[in-house]
Amino acid sequence: KTMQEQGHFSSYIYRGLKGTLYEGGHRVPFIVKWPKIIKDSIETDYLTCTTDFIATVAHLFDDILPENIGEDSVSFLPVLLGEDKNDIDRGGIVHHSDAGFFAIRKGKWKLIFDENAGSRRVDPKDKPLINPGEIQLFNMQTDAIESTNVAAQNIDIVEDLKKLMAKFINEGRSTVGKSQKNDPTPKGWKNVSHFESYLKIN
């Protein structure tokens, strides 16, 4: 609170705080120093997640992960080696809030399955959201500060992301491979009602 009073906000320009589904709770810089391999300075906006570390390390050592290990992990080693990849190549990433709510990100789109971004925490610097709603869709290329919910204008995108979220749950993974079981069952998960029609829950 004292830092905020002095004009310092830990989430910088981004909406939300740690624990929320907004960028202020998830977006962090990732810095790699590897002098023998990375000779020149490289800066990229390639989308990655902490879940990707296990696949990246396995890739580095030419190891193959078992089907039930790293089900949501994608290697970003090619990016470190200078290969030009984009967010679509990464596939979808599922975000999780401190209160158990979900969001999904694929490419430039991010869909939050909760009107309060999955948390009671509020950043006092944030301006009111334009077009609030039970679900929130943001174009992260043009609105990384998540100022405007564009779900109503992009119904097809919303449905596609709902289907993708359900697919990940149905298959127990967000990467290519043998389907895995979820533990516990999705029946008790929050937000499921938003995409329940696409789920295959016994």
Ranges and model annotations:
Residues 1-23, 38-42, 46, 51-136, ...:
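C-terminal cap/loop subdomain of S1 sulfatases and analogous C-terminal strand-loop tails that border
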Residues 31-33:
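Short beta-strand-to-turn element immediately C-terminal to the catalytic PLP-Schiff-base lysine
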Residues 5, 53, 106, 111, ...:
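Long, internal low-complexity/basic segments
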Residues 27-28:
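Catalytic cores of eukaryotic secretory-pathway lumenal/extracellular enzymes that build
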